[in-house]
């Protein structure tokens, strides 16, 4: 990214609106091929026929401008600006160009903010999705109610573009972005709005991911403001926030008005013990106070989505539960607050008393049924959890087959090592181990028992169960007692940045 900052500063110095000219820069598309963006959609299978031409990109952009979008006719669905070219490839290239360009100012701003806050060294640990669980273990045992929230998707891509317009002042760039989205919707006019946005997210993952993340960031920034000023808000006062520009321009004035003019009529709900966590499109809001406050926030969320983002969400999509009686699902774990009872003997002079102490602990367990469902979908077992052979891998060498199974088992063990109960984790390892043996036996056209007896592979396959112990022994080489204690306790690895396909079964 640093090697392109010189070009960006040059383009920025020439004119105020600097995003639009980047569309026609060769190095922007070269950036998509660099190692920094190796997750690009069109990088994976780049052959001779798929080598892009900047001249063709310019021609396609010109064609989008030349179409008259003010006149809608029956033949509009037949018009295709990508006619004569590789439609999917150049659609992805232009989408990738939009994504890269719009990421640049936010990436530079984010990098500078990290350096200013002096948290660059700890940034890698903060990025881990498992860094949230130590926070939950520390805070949630003292809370009583949890609200399970699924953030709704916008019904139209235009909503995502409008949100971004308030932060990036470049009218030509967004006009071209709208033309691109219009052409996409025009080519998929047979789809409903909900299916259309789902199709766009699959065919243009990078651009959609950026727009959606920005939408979530915007929603959370408004929520944090409401949380900070919650003692001055009532549900019937929410109508003053309808106009979004007015909201940002006058929010400080509104707070002063609330405090001065409505202090005698407002009902104050102060809740210092309220916590909010989110991963992807799901969030958890937990509080210690009565469910009345949680219901208040529930209606705030619904009105926020409807008024600011034109997203319809029914009250039934937000579930309020009691932590001691219900569990919530987050990042592949089921979590709930469990009561631990212990009896302490106390003696005073000649009298002995038994004192019962009740403490709360956050219980985090592996959801065995969803994982077995994911393993069955990947053809490692059937729906009942009985291991089966992975026939599609039978053409590989024995070493490759064992290595593939070991990597899957290692990743799942690494991810779920924070579980309170390891019995479910051992069952998953057993399924993968037996599936590996059956795959090898299928390859050699033998039974499982005959294959193990002939090849002596039983000791090699013990790695499925010894991998975790070897890692812990490297961390604590001399403390065997410590190793035994840690073997039954939770360990969170802060190098996990995302969940794999078998874990992501929502």
Swiss-Prot record:
tRNA processing keyword on record: yes
InterPro entries xref list: Domain_X (IPR024937), Maturase_MatK (IPR002866), Maturase_MatK_N (IPR024942)
Keywords tagged on the record: Chloroplast, mRNA processing, Plastid, RNA-binding, tRNA processing
Source organism superkingdom: Eukaryota
GO BP annotations listed: mRNA processing; RNA splicing; tRNA processing
One GO cellular component term: chloroplast
Family annotation (Pfam families): Intron_maturas2 (PF01348), MatK_N (PF01824)
GO MF, any single term: RNA binding
Principal place of residence: plastid
Cell location: Plastid, Chloroplast
PANTHER family reported for this sequence: MATURASE K
Family: Belongs to the intron maturase 2 family. MatK subfamily.
Protein task: Usually encoded in the trnK tRNA gene intron. Probably assists in splicing its own and other chloroplast group II introns.
Protein name as it appears in the record: Maturase K
Gene: matK
